[in-house]
Amino acid sequence: MSKHSSDLNNLISHIALYDSESAYKQFFKYLFPVLYRFSYCLLKSKELSEEVASDVMITLWKNRKNLPELENVKVYALVIARNLSLNVLNKHSRHELVSIDDIEIEVALDSLNPEQLLINGELKKRLEQATQSLPDKCKMVFKLIKEDGLSYKETASLLNISVKTVDAHLVTALKKLALVLHMEVNLLWLCI
């Protein structure tokens, strides 16, 4: 078991046993962004995604006594988020939900000169654009595995698809992102 899993399990235990609000706040800081990003992949709306993520966190707090019994609380929370998001989509099926979201990607900025910062900023922007241009399933699989750290099996279970389909979506996403980034890097070097 990783230290991260152990820390998460300790937080869950404190929430369940002691109704610890401080442990819940740490748990919230960890899980809310994951739930938000996942919901956003389905809903394409900042407001609705925040609402779904908040509803999941409230549900987890209300059911806190049962959390230690769950095998994987993160996957459980994502399943709730999926179901709530699908309910929202069903309610809004006649309306197209569109919003622009800024997915933050951490870039190591230590000892970079202004030119490198500019190049990294451009690459980050292009990567975000390339990620947004992926087909919905590819984008969702990419984010769940690469950004949220879920396994192929957990992702397959969450999306109700096979592990091989998860692998195929991830390969497609990585190929498209690599192609876009390769072209962008070549273009940036031509400009320098």
Tell what function each PLM region has.
Residues 65, 79-98:
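Arg/Lys-rich amphipathic alpha helix in sigma70-family domain 2
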Residues 129-132, 136, 140, 144, ...:
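Helix-turn-helix DNA-binding module
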Residues 28-46, 63, 131:
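Amphipathic, Lys/Arg- and hydrophobic-enriched alpha-helical face
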